[in-house]
Each structure stands twice: as C-alpha cells, then as structure tokens.
Regions:
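A short, flexible loop at the N-terminus of ABC-type nucleotide-binding domains that lies
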Residues: 2, 11-25, 74-77
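The feature captures the beta-strand-to-loop junction immediately N-terminal to the Walker
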Residues: 39-41
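Single conserved hydrophobic/aromatic residue that forms the stacking wall/gate
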Residues: 169-177
Length: 177
C-alpha cells in the first residue's frame, strides 16, 4: 500500500468572500508499515489534509495516488479506497448511531458485502482489540463513557481491516475507560 500526495493545495469556499487557504503545495509519500504524525496549531490544516487521504475532500490543486493510481481519475474505485484507508476523527464518538455497540461496529464490514459470519468475527475481534468486554457488546453506545465511546468508534474503523488508519488529533483518543 502506498499513498502519494503530490503538491496538493486546498481552498475552502473558493471564489467567495469567505475563501480561506487550508493547504498549500503539500507533498509526501506514505508507504506500507510507516507511521506518520502531523503536528500543528488549531486551524493549520491537519484534519483537512487527512480527509484528502481517502477522497473525502478533493484538492483544489495537485494529485493523490493510491497504489500508483490517481484517486480522482474516472473509473477509480473510491469505495475500495475508503475501505482501505480508515479515518478516525477528533470526536469519533459523534459517528456512533446504532442502538447496540456490536451493531455499530458491524455496520462498515456489512456494507462491504461480507458474509454475516465474517462481519461478526471482524466486529468481535475489533472490539476485543480496543478493550471492550464481551458483556458490553449489546449495550447502547450512548450509555458509555467518552473514552469507551471513542474505543467503540475506533473498533468500527478497525473492523473494516484498512491498510492504513489516519487519526486526527491522536491525543483526543486517549481514553478515560
């Protein structure tokens, strides 16, 4: 797996009176097995950059390549990219929506067209990996502490078995149990 970011720039609300440059001429290569950290002040473009890695945001200028293919070329499989590059945002607990923890973590893999058995195995393994006890699987995620909610949301991303996971605001994912 490789992601190449080639000279991307991004302008919010381009062509309006509210235009704001978030990224300017950013380039990097992320290879399989690498850990990359982004450090910067609030509003410096870290989250905007991360959103480019799986095509949630299209650069104003420049290109992004996944395994050698431009992700914005016609025919590129964006669904596969998004299943391979997982994003965990600053407040991942805001992406929880199901009535039970286990159902919430099953949502992503289920949408990959996997068998029910494979979906459940992935959910189980991911929840265990982030330290959620089996006896909590059928509780509402909304009854959990903030740290537990974050871990459930992270399990949902991990259950997709992405090649890469990008965390915005990694320190925000430290848990309080």
């Amino acid at each position: 797996m490789s992601i190449i970011v080639d000279n991307i720039s991004y302008i919010y609300e381009k062509g309006t009176g509210f235009e704001r440059q978030a990224l300017k001429n950013v380039s990097c290569a992320i290879e399989d097995g690498e850990f990359i950290g982004l450090i910067g002040h609030t509003g410096s473009g870290k989250s905007t950059f991360i959103q480019h890695l799986n095509g949630l945001v299209k650069p104003t200028e420049g290109h992004i390549y996944y395994n050698g293919k431009d992700i914005y070329e016609q025919g590129f499989n964006m669904k596969e990219l998004r299943s391979r590059v997982g994003l965990v945002f600053q407040y991942p607990e805001h992406q929880l929506f199901e009535t039970e923890i286990f159902k919430d973590v099953c949502f992503g893999p289920k949408n990959l067209g996997l068998s029910q058995k494979e979906v459940e195995i992935r959910a189980f393994e991911s929840l265990r990996l982030v330290g959620i006890d089996d006896n909590m699987f059928y509780q509402s995620p909304f009854d959990l502490s903030g740290g537990q909610k974050r871990r459930v949301a992270i399990a949902g991303v991990l259950a997709m078995k992405p090649d890469a996971v990008s965390y915005t605001h990694l320190r925000a994912h430290e848990t309080d149990s």
